Curated annotation (Swiss-Prot):
EC annotation from Swiss-Prot or TrEMBL: 6.1.1.10
Motif ('HIGH' region): 12-22
Organism: Chloroflexus aurantiacus (strain ATCC 29366 / DSM 635 / J-10-fl)
GO cellular component, one term: cytosol
Annotated localization: Cytoplasm
Entry similarity comment: Belongs to the class-I aminoacyl-tRNA synthetase family. MetG type 1 subfamily.
Functional description taken from the UniProt entry: Is required not only for elongation of protein synthesis but also for the initiation of all mRNA translation through initiator tRNA(fMet) aminoacylation.
GO biological process: methionyl-tRNA aminoacylation
Protein name listed in UniProt: Methionine--tRNA ligase
Quaternary organization: Monomer.
Amino acid sequence: MPEHILVAVAWPYANGPRHIGHVAGFGVPADIFARYHRLRGNHVLMISGTDEHGTPITLVADKEGTTPQAIADRYNKIIGDDLYNLGLSYDIFTRTTTANHYAVTQDIFRTLYERGYIIRQETLGAFSATTGRTLPDRYIEGTCPICGYDEARGDQCDNCGSQLDPTDLINPRSKVDGQPPVFKPTEHFFLDLPAFAEQLHAWIDRQTHWRPNVRNFSLNFLKELKPRAITRDLEWGVPIPLPEYVHRDDKKIYVWFDAVIGYLSASIEWARNSGQPDAWRTWWQNPAARHFYFMGKDNIVFHTVIWPAMLLGYGAGGDFGTDPSGTYQGVPLQLPYNVVSSEFLTMEGKKFSSSRGIVIYVNDFLSRYDADALRYFLTIAGPENQDTDFTWAEFVRRNNDELVATWGNLVNRTLTNVYKNFGSVPQPGPLTATDEQLIQEVNGGLETVGDLLATARFKAALSEAMRLAAQVNIYLSEQEPWKVIKSDRERAATIWYVALRCVDTLKIIFTPFLPFSSQRLHEYLGYDGYIAGPLSFRDVTEADGRVHRVLTGNYAEWVGRWQPSALPVGQALRQPQPLFKKLDEKVVDEELARMQSRAS
């Protein structure tokens, strides 16, 4: 039976373009996972959008003399274009400034407040000494009072995992201007996390399939659980849905609270855009559906503790759709099944920093290099389980010595020879035991690679796919069909037929990782239709008349299936071209020079 799989992807913040470190953590792994499950025939809903509220966007707007909405509009388009060009197959990539998102966020706030899970507390708010604006917790750094780590943030210490408030930090400083923040008394609304402590602990304790760092970090976080502020003193954000705040512009819902709700609001928007307003329920109120969340390690607790607490408190909640059948009335919203957290990517041994020029933005990268080359590197050498470093030398080496030399070489030598000598899939003679064994080994890769992908072990899955491609290369080198054809055309045809069958199966195995080249290979092999695309943009008009663009795709029309090759004898091939480009080693010096130029 096909499964319902929700792929919930962290929302990139719309205060600037995204660099390759961002997509290494949230974008590429999620897309690989979603593509695999679609090929398996599962019902996938991959969702995200740009996170468009909060102080950082207002700071950019002030600097440029424009409005926060204008900044959000600009970077929503830039980020959306980048994700499209990288081939991230969202069912919907939307934004948090839509009327739909406001309505869903306010309904959840109101419901939690009415049930007593949102409380009011007097607290000390952090403000910038230079601008007077609220400083988000993550824009305040200082020394952790628990472990002494000197880059602890105002919400938590990434070194020891302690939950913090800005006032807890020793020598706190603003990341905006380096000055100590000014703390002023203010009233805020708080999510009463301790009310869910027992439920959360029991639930997380059962998630033995989570990555150990995610589970352990979450359990440690529960030890010091305390109410979490969900409002801030600012003008840019979702309005607080209580009567006394209807006409107030000085206090809004905190950006982190509305951002995680985006997973639900985006699902609801997708359903309405699809003409089936209740379709979201088959993912969110279906006990058999499984939810997978993808993000960087700095966002773990938002997805393992805070968002689950909100879902538990909301329960069956209100009614975001009509539900005419009454099937889902009283059915609670689904909790995460797995939270797939990536570590951090550095660049040339240093943290990414736009101000210091230590950065390569996605659009800049893709203007000079192929998307599949980046996707390959970020998977095979990315920060899946530990912090890793991107260097231009290693990127060029991986591209040339692995992607081009193994998979690219196999495809090129096979298709070029077959196209030249036969023009179509040749009729094979009797298969030898060696032939049969190779086909069986490659077909078995569908299970081994599939099992690894299903458990979010992307690096191991891609390594196994590359190993299988190398085995087919070894087979060709040993069988030498380019020599055999001179004396035994039938045997040569058989060898090339076996290679084509293996290449066709490997095409499917590589599709989640390398969708662009897999689609081209699909066409070179004489097939029609899409196995990996296309993506598209669509304009959506809301009830209030506003129009926004979403990234989407009609993935139901994909012809690819996670099955062994059924390549028909006699199918005409199309003239092949190399799948990948070999890079000149001078690229390394050129890119390092660009980085140096940005820094200066």
